[in-house]
Amino acid sequence: MLASGLLLVASVAFLSVLVLMSVWKQRKLSGKLPPGPTPLPFIGNYLQLNTEKMYSSLMKISQRYGPVFTIHLGPRRVVVLCGQEAVKEALVDQAEEFSGRGEQATFDWLFKGYGVAFSSGERAKQLRRFSIATLRDFGVGKRGIEERIQEEAGFLIESFRKTNGALIDPTFYLSRTVSNVISSIVFGDRFDYEDKEFLSLLRMMLGSFQFTATSTGQLYEMFSSVMKHLPGPQQQAFKELQGLEDFITKKVEQNQRTLDPNSPRDFIDSFLIRMLEEKKNPNTEFYMKNLVLTTLNLFFAGTETVSTTLRYGFLLLMKHPDIEAKVHEEIDRVIGRNRQAKYEDRMKMPYTEAVIHEIQRFADMIPMGLARRVTKDTKFREFLLPKGTEVFPMLGSVLKDPKFFSNPNDFNPKHFLDDKGQFKKSDAFVPFSIGKRYCFGEGLARMELFLFLTNIMQNFCFKSPQAPQDIDVSPRLVGFATIPPNYTMSFLSR
């Protein structure tokens, strides 16, 4: 009895010493790092966070500590930036210092600092420069890609017509359509909508993307060093990511066998040619691992974000039939019913442009942004962030900044309209991030959102099995990503 009592006292004393050391260490750094709740050893601020509502938890902490604060996600120390001012100061005004890539533990299981999206430094710069130039070579930002989107929109509309107004889940209708646009660039061809391998890839992408938004996904962000060895949903996410990598590797091998260095067919060919050109460069970033993982970055990002935004958009328009009716009216007035929408039409369609921007703002696809890392000791406001400090630029807090949007939690296209009903830009519209590492697929995504939505709405009215007032537009999951509720709907020909 005495021995067990002494053991208990010793354990409590040991834990107390650890906590005191943690507090001392935190206070020692308080003159440098932003303030924040005191972390416990290893678990950090886990007890102050709700992994089911990580974004909301962090925003609640910001109410106490201000727009720039420090949080410990398990053993991982992160500086969090909230609101348009703080995020712009970091990502634009001090763009170079904040250009490093932080952790995204689920994706890091596969990428490990390779590929254009999750790399840093010279590797990121070279791969980004090459990717932007190559996408342009294959028509992105030009008439060529617009025609490809219009063609794919035609296939999608035909698929919706075949449903004859029955209730359907639009998830894979949208993802296979959006994915085919980026597929034609990176693989040189589109997939048939019923291709089983294609549908399997889309499920893998959706599964791993949704995992990052779950409570387990957020827990994994804190304790990946332990959880990667344990059974659980994270193992399924790894399996899905591995399946995607295997598919890309197979595609690359097919291209290698039939490569003509004088006539690149797609992004993979262009990268393979660059690899041949830089074969004797010992510092080259153009090798197989970066090819496979950069291609996967483009394929994944070019599929999930736009298709999920459209899926959220359909739900919001069914919730607000008055807004849907105004978009229909503008489409009929500007485009009519006898030709496809063109990207230049948006200049004469301020209301539709405002609706699309408001869908993106409300959907808030990546609310905590892709984590950054400071590339050197960085003075930020009155703080000093040591080199390597991770940073969360909370894009959701910018998209919902009350200084820029009068009712940030409401869906209202007037957020992007002036008093005369003309479209107005906002400095707080940052769904593609800002600064040196903004999403370089932004131009393609904007074109896809406009052309897909207008061409679909030119042909169909949206019908929910629920009355508008009963439709819940609250996200199903919010973590790294925002996932809209599952729903069914009918596409009724106009």
Curated annotation (Swiss-Prot):
TM regions (residue ranges): none
Signals that turn on the gene: By 3-methylcholanthrene (3MC).
Tissue specificity field: Lung.
Single biological process term from Gene Ontology: xenobiotic metabolic process
Leading EC class: oxidoreductase
Keyword field: Acetylation, Endoplasmic reticulum, Heme, Iron, Membrane, Metal-binding, Microsome, Monooxygenase, Oxidoreductase, Phosphoprotein
GO cellular component, one term: cytoplasm
MF GO annotations: arachidonate epoxygenase activity; heme binding; iron ion binding; monooxygenase activity; oxidoreductase activity, acting on paired donors, with incorporation or reduction of molecular oxygen, reduced flavin or flavoprotein as one donor, and incorporation of one atom of oxygen; oxygen binding
Residues reported to bind heme: 439
Cofactor(s) essential for the protein: heme
EC number: 1.14.14.1
Keyword flag Phosphoprotein: yes
Residues recorded as bearing N6-acetyllysine in the entry: 379
Superkingdom assignment: Eukaryota
Coiled-coil boundaries: none
Keyword RNA-binding among UniProt keywords: no
Topology of this chain in the membrane: Peripheral membrane protein
Free-text function comment from the UniProt entry: Cytochromes P450 are a group of heme-thiolate monooxygenases. In liver microsomes, this enzyme is involved in an NADPH-dependent electron transport pathway. It oxidizes a variety of structurally unrelated compounds, including steroids, fatty acids, and xenobiotics.
Family statement drawn from the similarity comment of this UniProt entry: Belongs to the cytochrome P450 family.
Protein name per UniProt: Cytochrome P450 2A3
Organism: Rattus norvegicus
